[in-house]
């Protein structure tokens, strides 16, 4: 299995990817470094595929990974509900390729290459 270490321990890396995945599901578009976006892409694609499956086991697998954060305050919807009700139905006929990565310029402080990752 191939992955990027991202300069962190495995627990820190997993926590960061969980946070970024939850943020991408809630906001549908985030700005991060290019390598984080490329690593995040595979995780988000798996979560959306779980959402498309839609059974109880898939919901529990996604709930074990996605943080319990409020996605929409007016109808009290959390990130997991948004994944299974809104995002999964949007990509029902699409077979993968749910995300798009657009490269930006370098970050001002350290020159790290930045990118925007968004749901298609």
From Swiss-Prot:
* UniProt cross-references to InterPro entries, sorted A to Z: Ribosomal_bL17 (IPR000456), Ribosomal_bL17_CS (IPR047859), Ribosomal_bL17_sf (IPR036373)
Q: What span is annotated as the signal peptide, if there is one?
A: none
UniProt entry keywords in alphabetical sequence: Ribonucleoprotein, Ribosomal protein
Under Gene Ontology molecular function, one entry of this record is:
structural constituent of ribosome
Cellular component (GO) terms are: cytosolic large ribosomal subunit
Q: Quote the Pfam families the UniProt record gives.
A: Ribosomal_L17
User: What processes does the entry annotate via GO biological process terms?
Assistant: translation
Q: Which domain of life is it from?
A: Bacteria
Q: Which family does it belong to?
A: Belongs to the bacterial ribosomal protein bL17 family.
Classification via PANTHER family: LARGE RIBOSOMAL SUBUNIT PROTEIN BL17M (PTHR14413:SF16), RIBOSOMAL PROTEIN L17 (PTHR14413)
Please give the subunit comment from the record: Part of the 50S ribosomal subunit. Contacts protein L32.
Please identify the protein, giving its name as recorded: Large ribosomal subunit protein bL17
Taxonomy of the source species:
Bacteria, Bacillati, Bacillota, Bacilli, Bacillales
Q: Which gene encodes it?
A: rplQ
């Amino acid at each position: 299995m191939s992955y990027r270490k991202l300069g962190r321990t495995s627990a820190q890396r997993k926590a960061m990817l969980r946070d970024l995945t939850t943020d991408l599901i809630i906001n549908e578009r985030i700005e991060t470094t290019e390598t984080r976006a490329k690593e995040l892409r595979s995780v988000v694609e798996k979560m959306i595929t779980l959402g498309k499956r839609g059974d109880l086991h898939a919901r529990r697998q996604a709930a074990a990974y996605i943080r319990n954060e409020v996605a929409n305050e007016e109808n009290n919807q959390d990130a997991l509900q948004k994944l299974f009700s809104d995002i999964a139905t949007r990509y029902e006929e699409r077979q993968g390729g749910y995300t798009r990565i657009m490269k930006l310029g370098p970050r001002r402080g350290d020159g790290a290459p930045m990118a925007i990752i968004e749901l298609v």
